[in-house]
Amino acid sequence: MRFLVIGRGWTGNKVHDALLNRGHTVEFISHHEVDGALRDLPSFDWVVNCAGVTGSPNVDACEFDKENTVIGNAVFPIILHEKLKNTRSKLAHFSSGCIYVGDIQGSYAEPNFFGSIYSISKGISDIYLKDRAMVFRIRMPFTGVNEKKNYLTKVYNYAKTAKLIDAGQNSLTDIDEAVSVACDLMEEDAPLGPYNLVNQGSINMHDLAQIMGIEPEWFTPEEFRVATAAGRSTCTIPDTGRMRPVKEALADAVAKMKLT
């Protein structure tokens, strides 16, 4: 199969490498290079959008760059889909589960969290693409490699320099597992629609701190609201059944990080 992977960030690199390792032909571009690459659209089986604005070092940064956040997370995926109309290429889009708050049930639910421009922008494209693309939702992605986009790396760093907040149970994503499942779904030509690529079960921050072997200080909810510019999504969403239990995946990732 022939793939066009858009977005040279953390997720895009993982998707690119995974597809190459499976023997596929892969063209890898940044979102700035899309117009030129799309001239060759008829030859791609899948266009995989991994581009997006997440904010650095965290989602608070999006509040101070609303225009680019909306363009990257809402406008760009919709325009990309429109460019694919009347071609043989199908669109796969990496989205976010941080469009929800609470315990979400059922195969599909409308976004219900609007506490940050990041979540709002992701929710817009999620709604538009739900029947038009394969939508891969991930949450708080982690891996066993110590790198800045790794959720576990962020937690380690926050525990050293600030405090943590435990707002309740969350679904999380082992990003390497998620990428593997995403590749499986595209190879299988699975139905278009949303796929929650989260590990089975959920975890709260106190339990995560115990797995990680850290003893952080904790924000009160009031302190956290004062310290942050954006609200945070706290939610559990149904999993696909294709990924490991979250506590098993986290323990494995933490063990690998301590070895490197």
Name the predicted role of every residue range.
Residues 34-72:
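NAD(P)H-binding glycine-rich loop region in Rossmannoid oxidoreductase-like domains
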Residues 1-22:
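N-terminal Rossmann NAD(P)H-binding glycine-rich loop of SDR-like oxidoreductase domains
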Residues 61-92:
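NAD(P)-cofactor binding segment of oxidoreductase domains
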